[in-house]
Curated annotation (Swiss-Prot):
Pathway: Amino-acid biosynthesis; L-leucine biosynthesis; L-leucine from 3-methyl-2-oxobutanoate: step 1/4. Belongs to the alpha-IPM synthase/homocitrate synthase family. LeuA type 2 subfamily. Residues 30-303 form the Pyruvate carboxyltransferase domain. Signal peptide: none annotated. It is found in: Cytoplasm. The gene is leuA. Gene3D superfamilies: 3.30.160.270, Aldolase class I (3.20.20.70). Catalyzes the condensation of the acetyl group of acetyl-CoA with 3-methyl-2-oxobutanoate (2-ketoisovalerate) to form 3-carboxy-3-hydroxy-4-methylpentanoate (2-isopropylmalate). This is 2-isopropylmalate synthase. It catalyses: 3-methyl-2-oxobutanoate + acetyl-CoA + H2O = (2S)-2-isopropylmalate + CoA + H(+). The lineage of its organism: Bacteria, Pseudomonadati, Pseudomonadota, Alphaproteobacteria, Hyphomicrobiales. It comes from Brucella suis biovar 1 (strain 1330). InterPro entries: 2-isopropylmalate_synth_dimer, AIPM/Hcit_synth_CS, Aldolase_TIM, IPM_Synthase, LeuA-like_post-cat, LeuA_allosteric_dom_sf, LeuA_N_DRE-TIM, PYR_CT. Its main location: cytoplasm. Homodimer.
Length: 555
């Protein structure tokens, strides 16, 4: 790359030593305006036809956007026709205002009013570019010439609105605001304000777009705060933000801009738009939601939002996209999985409605996702993740030492195969190793116990087993069935074994529930686990002992 300082110069930042926005907090949601059907649509390789537009439009209404920019009706017949459809057949709720975009050109303004005939309180959004670069390179005009473009358009729009009988709302944008000197932007905006003559009951929207993101988010916040302080008739204005994401900080710039005094945000679902996109209003809304602020948008079915986005825009959402990507509620890391597992357990036992689970800033169910894919297993996964999957999907509450033991088995498989293991495969490996044991030597069949006549408090157990398919009867003594069965197997196999840990639980609810038992067995070479599942709790325990014994003699 060329030396940075010889090819690129830093864009100047305003001097605002008494800025107040850093100490502010976002306390309420802004007025939201979707520009998916205009700014988003113009950025598509294959712009939307009517069906794709209508599907997006219905979603935006269902989500609760109070303002929706439906197109640039003077730019194409497609946009004009959709505007007419929305007004005549779109069943637009009374609390939703439709917005259209128009350049400051007389013939386009006339066509725009034709498109809006019969609309309820439509917003006419007129704009012209004001930046130093575009004044010099594109328009070859001085500040006075650029200001006249804006004021001539404002006069024409106000005259036509008056003749049409009123009911219109107005929005002006000094396009490429972030590349415009602040005093120039102020001069042009104030000139438009003077013509529109807004009131507190009929406010003018002054939109201050970061058409191209040119600086750090704090600079945009300084620009917004400066304009909020200096614009004429501020109480009669709605200050709007329209950030883009060229530097990857559109979300941060918007949030700081709201702290700096803005009232409104224009953006798109999941950030579709020219170049790197417009600001993502879904991420903004859910950022607020997770801070306890009502976002004013309904994001409870984020899967539908994703589906409509991908259908209407013919674009795919990245797997790591905040809140909506396939993997954003998923942990592969062992330490993360362990923390999530413990957090979910703590939440189940807590009596607080507050969401507090490590590594999950939002409850996936709040946006229509499930807990099924929170933890997924690969070579980076730990015991907590595997335990969570077996508990969540199959109702198995593995003892901690068994979690450690089984994790090593799964680790070996993932290292060998080099890919993620789905939940079903993990359960199948658990069943094969501990429960079904298809190649096992010993199988449990039945048992009986009776008091030991020679020693009070102890019992004699006789058990029927098969050894490589041959039926055998074995006998042992102990304080109970498990103790006696371990004694019998130890003598029969010639290996001293003893149980050091035992636990069990039901696999379902009700009187016909199966039981699962876990035993940790010590033998001369170490210790390991066995697992048994049976309708009878005692039989499940003895099957767990056989499971462990089979693993001992297989070593």
């Amino acid at each position: 790359m060329p030396i940075a300082g010889t090819k690129y110069a830093p864009f100047p930042a305003p001097q605002l030593d008494d800025r107040t926005w850093p100490s502010k907090r976002i306390e309420k949601a802004p007025i939201w305006c979707s520009v998916d059907l205009r700014d988003g649509n113009q950025a598509l390789i294959d712009p939307m036809g009517h069906d794709r537009k209508e599907r997006m439009f219905r979603l935006l209404i269902d989500m609760g956007f109070p303002e929706i920019e439906i197109g640039f009706p003077s730019a194409s017949q497609t946009d004009f026709d959709f505007c007419r459809w929305a007004i005549e057949q779109g069943d637009v709720p009374d609390d939703v205002d439709l917005q259209v975009l128009v350049q400051c050109r007389p013939e386009l303004i006339t066509r725009t009013f034709e498109a809006l005939e019969g609309a309820k309180t439509p917003i006419i959004h007129f704009y012209n570019s004001t930046s130093e670069l575009q004044r010099r390179v594109v328009f070859a005009k001085d500040v006075g010439g650029i200001k006249q473009i804006a004021t001539d358009a404002a006069k024409m729009i106000m005259d036509m609105a008056a003749k049409a009988g009123g009911g219109y709302r107005f929005q002006y944008s000094p396009e490429s605001f972030t590349g415009t000197e602040l005093d120039v932007a102020l001069e042009i905006c104030n000139a438009v304000i003077e013509i529109v003559k807004p009131t507190p009951d009929n406010k003018l929207i002054v939109n201050l777009p970061s058409t191209v993101e040119m600086n750090t988010p704090n600079v945009y916040a300084d620009q917004i705060e400066w304009m909020c302080r200096n614009l004429d008739n501020r109480e009669s204005l709605i200050i709007s933000l329209h950030p883009h994401n060229d530097r990857g900080t559109g979300i941060a710039a918007t949030e700081l801009g709201l702290m700096a005094g803005a009232d409104r945000v224009e953006g798109t679902l999941f950030g579709n738009g020219e170049r790197t996109g417009n600001v993502d209003v879904v991420t903004l809304a859910l950022n607020m939601y997770t801070q306890g602020i009502d976002p004013g948008l309904d994001c409870t079915d984020i899967n539908r939002m994703k589906e409509v986005y991908e259908y209407s825009n013919q674009l795919k959402i990245a797997e790591r996209h905040p809140y909506v990507g396939e993997l954003v509620y998923t942990a592969f890391s062992g330490s993360h999985q362990d923390a999530i597992n413990k957090g979910m357990k703590a939440r189940r036992s807590a009596n607080s409605p507050v969401w507090e689970v490590p590594y999950l800033p939002i409850d996936p169910q709040d946006v229509g996702r499930s807990y099924e894919a929170i933890i997924r297993i690969n070579s980076q996964s730990g015991k907590g993740g595997i335990a969570y999957i077996l508990q969540a999907d199959y109702g198995l509450n593995l003892p901690r030492n068994l979690q450690v033991e089984f994790r090593e088995i799964i680790q070996h498989i993932t290292d060998e195969e080099g890919k993620e293991l789905p939940s079903k495969r993990i359960y199948e490996e658990f069943q094969k190793l501990y429960v079904t044991q298809p190649d096992a030597r010993i199988k449990f069949v039945d048992h009986h116990t009776y008091p030991d006549p020679e020693q009070k408090g102890r019992r004699i157990l006789t058990a029927e087993i098969t050894d490589n398919g041959v039926t055998k009867t074995i006998e042992g003594k102990g304080t109970g069935p498990i103790d006696g069965f371990v004694d019998a197997l130890s003598k029969y196999l010639g290996v001293k074994m003893s149980v050091v840990d035992y636990s069990e639980h039901s696999l379902q609810q009700g009187s016909d529930a199966s039981a699962i038992s876990y035993v940790e067995m010590v033998y001369p070479g170490g210790k390991l686990f066995g697992v048994g599942i049976n309708d009878n709790i005692v039989s499940a325990s003895l099957e767990a002992v056989v499971s462990a014994a089979n693993r001992v003699i297989a070593k």
